[in-house]
């Protein structure tokens, strides 16, 4: 069976595009929330008659959905903008848009820095893209960064996958971590109603989607802003209740959620994840530091001991669960002993994956003004050491998969080998496997396949599908 028999699943909104229409190009920087916002904005553009360009330099409208979580991400945006500003000077008909967190942070000052811009819009205005572009078409330069109630999303997003989809459930962040710019650029928490979330998931299931990731900046804070108290005296709307509410959506085989905050990760939530069969055994729970004094300086609102209890409870209920996290090294005042405690915690927890970052001072955050900043050389050295530890631990965690059979959701064709499919296990391991089983059965993207793991690497697995065992 040749690879040409494999189906390349195209999201419905990408099919049959008329190349004679005005075209757009979106470049997304940063987190999953930005990726979900970009999908919605692409859907708005296509509902306006735009089609996706084949290349950025061919597009009639270029939109950068930006990230300001660290300085290097922000500087990359300005590099891209410089190139497009020259295009705009050569082609006044080009529409140039900056969306997302850099737009929210800089506002009108972006127009002074890049006068060629047509539209500057913060993340709370993503669903207003059509209205804002209409103002641009009337000859205005538009800045939309005021605090705004996020309208319920009634657009059809242009999904980047036809199998796995994002669904936003809560926008914004009410935390005040001393290093983080997110609350000032994404605004206060705004939770969507559970009925609207379920309706969106039902629509995705009808299109053939198999896996949904529920998204929020602090997703386990979901529902704090929604009214309602139960007879037991607890909030009526929590992430736990939401998982129960959407778990039986027909056609959806897997549920994930991200990103969690240790402050709100409850035993009740853990028990629901263990009891609900569609919830995958993978949890992304940032810890940021292994030192309590630093966690207090960061205003994280929990201790290392609480974090340990959460992980212990997860592994008690779901022994094979994978845990990923975020960590910052080089935070102001971090001593060598405090840094070593972070290394020790990484070893102790045996994380499956850790996203590491050197502390980067951000505008309008308390930590950026402190006098005890660490030299860049110290940050770089600590980051290098911690990355080596993370990679070693990830490989050691993956070794236990050798020879096991894992359920893998085939998400697409391996771009490096057209005879292979690629997908993820329930524990979020990227896995490559032959599209053809030993008995000649050809699996397709969207199939749930039992795969025997033959080889492991630090951040991926590869294996062989068992004979004729596509689960769906």
Curated annotation (Swiss-Prot):
Keyword flag Cytoplasm: yes
One Gene Ontology MF term: methylthiotransferase activity
Domain Radical SAM core as annotated: residue spans: 159-396
Residues that coordinate or bind [4Fe-4S] cluster 2: 173, 177, 180
Domain TRAM intervals: 399-467
Broad class of the protein's primary localization: cytoplasm
Top enzyme category: transferase
Catalytic activity: N(6)-dimethylallyladenosine(37) in tRNA + (sulfur carrier)-SH + AH2 + 2 S-adenosyl-L-methionine = 2-methylsulfanyl-N(6)-dimethylallyladenosine(37) in tRNA + (sulfur carrier)-H + 5'-deoxyadenosine + L-methionine + A + S-adenosyl-L-homocysteine + 2 H(+)
Binding sites annotated in the UniProt record for [4Fe-4S] cluster 1: 31, 67, 101
One GO-annotated biological process of the protein: tRNA methylthiolation
Domain of life: Bacteria
E.C. number: 2.8.4.3
Compartments reported by the entry: Cytoplasm
This protein's UniProt keywords: 4Fe-4S, Cytoplasm, Iron, Iron-sulfur, Metal-binding, S-adenosyl-L-methionine, Transferase, tRNA processing
Comment on bound cofactor: Binds 2 [4Fe-4S] clusters. One cluster is coordinated with 3 cysteines and an exchangeable S-adenosyl-L-methionine.
All copies of domain MTTase N-terminal, residue ranges: 22-138
Pfam families attached to this UniProt entry: Radical_SAM (PF04055), TRAM (PF01938), UPF0004 (PF00919)
Description of how the protein assembles with itself and partners: Monomer.
HAMAP family: tRNA_metthiotr_MiaB
Record's protein name: tRNA-2-methylthio-N(6)-dimethylallyladenosine synthase
Protein's organism: Synechococcus sp. (strain CC9902)
């Amino acid at each position: 069976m040749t690879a040409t028999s494999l189906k390349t699943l195209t999201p419905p909104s990408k099919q049959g595009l008329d190349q004679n229409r005005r075209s757009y190009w979106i470049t997304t920087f940063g987190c999953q929330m930005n990726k979900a916002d970009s999908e919605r904005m692409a859907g708005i553009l296509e509902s306006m008659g735009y089609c996706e360009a084949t290349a950025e330099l061919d597009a009639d409208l270029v939109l950068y959905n930006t990230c300001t979580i660290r300085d290097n991400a922000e500087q990359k945006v300005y590099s891209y903008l410089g190139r497009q500003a020259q295009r705009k000077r050569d082609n006044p008909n080009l529409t140039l848009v900056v969306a997302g967190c850099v737009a929210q942070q800089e506002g009108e000052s972006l127009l002074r820095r890049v006068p060629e811009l047509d539209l500057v819009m913060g993340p709370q205005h993503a669903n207003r893209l059509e209205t804002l572009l209409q103002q641009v078409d009337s000859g205005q330069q538009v800045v939309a960064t005021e605090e705004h109630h996020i309208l319920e999303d009634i657009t059809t997003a242009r999904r980047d996958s036809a199998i796995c989809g994002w669904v936003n459930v809560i926008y914004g962040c009410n935390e005040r971590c001393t290093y983080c710019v997110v609350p000032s650029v994404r605004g206060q928490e705004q939770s969507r109603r559970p009925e609207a979330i379920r309706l969106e998931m039902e629509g995705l299931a009808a299109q053939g989607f198999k896996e949904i990731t529920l998204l929020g900046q602090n997703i386990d804070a979901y529902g704090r802003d929604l009214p309602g108290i139960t007879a037991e005296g607890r909030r009526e709307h929590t992430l736990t209740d939401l998982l129960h509410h959407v778990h039986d959506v027909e056609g959806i085989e897997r549920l994930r959620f991200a990103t969690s905050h240790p402050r709100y990760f409850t035993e009740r939530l853990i028990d629901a994840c263990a009891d609900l069969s569609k919830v995958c055994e993978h949890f992304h729970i940032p810890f940021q530091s292994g030192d309590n004094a630093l966690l207090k300086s960061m205003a994280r609102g929990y201790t290392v001991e609480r974090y340990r209890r959460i992980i212990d409870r997860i592994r008690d209920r779901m022994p094979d669960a994978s845990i990923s996290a975020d960590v910052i090294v080089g935070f102001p005042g971090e001593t060598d002993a405090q840094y070593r405690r972070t290394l020790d915690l990484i070893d102790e927890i045996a994380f499956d994956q850790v996203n590491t970052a050197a502390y980067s001072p951000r505008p309008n955050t308390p930590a950026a003004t402190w006098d005890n900043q660490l030299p860049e050389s110290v940050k770089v050295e600590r980051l290098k050491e911690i990355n080596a530890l993370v990679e070693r631990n990830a490989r050691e965690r993956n070794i236990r998969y050798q020879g096991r059979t894992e359920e893998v959701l085939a998400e697409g064709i391996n771009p490096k080998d057209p005879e292979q499919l690629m997908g993820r296990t329930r524990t979020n391991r990227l896995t490559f496997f032959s599209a053809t089983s030993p008995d000649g059965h050809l699996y397709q993207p969207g199939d749930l396949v039992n795969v025997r793991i033959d080889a492991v690497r630090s951040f991926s697995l590869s294996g062989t599908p068992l004979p004729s065992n596509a689960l769906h």
